[in-house]
Design a protein with these regions (language model features):
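C-terminal and late-domain segments of enzyme folds
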Residues: 27-76, 86, 90, 98, ...
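Bacterial N-terminal signal peptides that target proteins for export
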Residues: 1-11
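Catalytic nucleophile loop
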Residues: 133-134, 156-177
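Portal/gating segments that form or line small-molecule/metal binding sites
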Residues: 86-126
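Catalytic-core regions built around general acid/base machinery
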Residues: 123, 146-160
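Structural motif
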Residues: 56, 129-133
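Glycine/threonine-rich flexible loop motifs
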Residues: 137-147
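Bacterial N-terminal signal peptides
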Residues: 10-21
Length: 339
């Protein structure tokens, strides 16, 4: 074979190789009627040593330092984002802007069948970091509860890899969650009637470390959600789901990163609020304004401030008590301010 013929043969062989590689990696932009999959970086699985952790993010602009913390704990492995709607916009940001990962992958689970798909489940289970994007938490409860996706999320936590969520993704991380099944609810309406249909709560979805007996809420100060969080807590204890319940309210552009010992550190702008119930509410009935006195509140405001979730205590920040009296909130702070 002369040189020219040899070169043509090599080029043809390379063409076949490229074509076969493209076929093998078709799921890189998988598009079915049950899920969509997108990736930046290496689509093949790698295994990296990880460290456990949680990222609880309050919505709006993401907190870069919290994602970098997750990436560090991922060991530079595969960073997987799951959601029920939206786009793959996290992928280029994580892979190119933040860097330090083998891949950034987004799985959009469109239907319950997608939450049982072996490809989807393998991608989640093999993640070195897993993040639940914002959206509508009812989609997550409706599509994922009782499925292999729920089991896969628990598996990632159990193997000691970091797991996080923002906004709706934050809402489903606690033992208890506000599902928004009937739509959202504002504080004044929740306080006015704790048993109205929009106060839709769930107690049997995810079970993550240090979030037992906890319900979370996001966009906290920006959307005035203290009243509804107090109402959620009242319902949880009044309905017998827990003898004592705890709430974590996280403001926008703010995150808590939680290490393997349960120490939560504030990243971003703050503040974050930690609430704890004192017992049963005085009045928590259908079509009757809530009366619930003396909930313990702890506020962290400064980046780097810490709270021990295992002991539910801190040497930093501000402590006060909060009460609902016939649907109206007040506190022991100067002027009675609830935040």
């Amino acid at each position: 074979m002369n040189g020219k013929s040899h070169m043509i043969g090599v080029l043809l062989a390379l063409g076949v190789l490229v074509a076969s590689t493209a076929v093998v990696q078709a799921p890189v932009l998988a598009n079915s009627n049950t899920y969509e999959y997108y990736v930046e970086g290496n689509a093949e699985d790698v295994t990296k040593p990880t460290q456990p952790g949680l990222v609880l993010m309050g919505g709006s602009t993401d907190v870069d330092s919290a994602f970098l913390w997750m990436i560090e704990r991922s060991g530079g492995g595969d960073f997987v984002v799951i959601r029920a709607a939206g786009t793959e916009a996290y992928n280029p940001w994580i892979y190119y802007d933040l860097g330090g990962v083998d891949s950034a992958e987004t799985i959009i689970i469109l239907k319950p069948e997608g939450a049982q798909d072996p490809f989807v489940i393998d991608k989640i289970r093999n993640a070195e970091a897993l993040f639940i994007a914002g959206g509508n938490q009812w989609d997550y409860a409706r599509l994922w509860k009782g499925t292999l996706v729920e089991e896969a999320i628990q598996y990632v936590t159990a193997k000691g890899a970091p797991v996080g969520g923002t906004s709706a993704g934050l809402a489903v991380l606690g033992e208890f969650s506000f599902t928004a099944e009937k739509g959202t609810i504002v504080s004044k309406n929740a306080l006015k009637n704790p048993y109205q249909p929009r106060v839709a709560l769930e107690n049997d979805f995810l079970h993550l470390p240090y979030l037992g007996s906890v319900i979370t809420d996001s966009h906290f100060v920006a959307r005035d959600r203290m009243g509804r969080l107090v109402t959620f807590l009242a319902r949880i204890v009044n309905d017998g789901w827990a003898g004592q319940a705890r709430g974590i309210g996280i403001n926008e552009r703010t995150a808590l990163v939680v290490d393997g010992a349960g120490i939560a550190t504030l990243h971003g702008e703050g503040p974050v609020y930690f609430l704890q119930t004192p017992g049963l509410p005085e009045v928590c009935e259908k079509s009757t304004p809530l009366t619930y006195r003396d909930l313990a509140v702890y506020r962290l405001s400064e980046p780097g401030a810490q709270f021990d979730l295992a002991e539910w205590s801190s040497d930093e920040g501000t402590a006060y008590t909060l009460s609902a009296e016939e649907g109206v909130l007040s506190s022991t702070q100067a002027g009675g301010g609830i935040y």
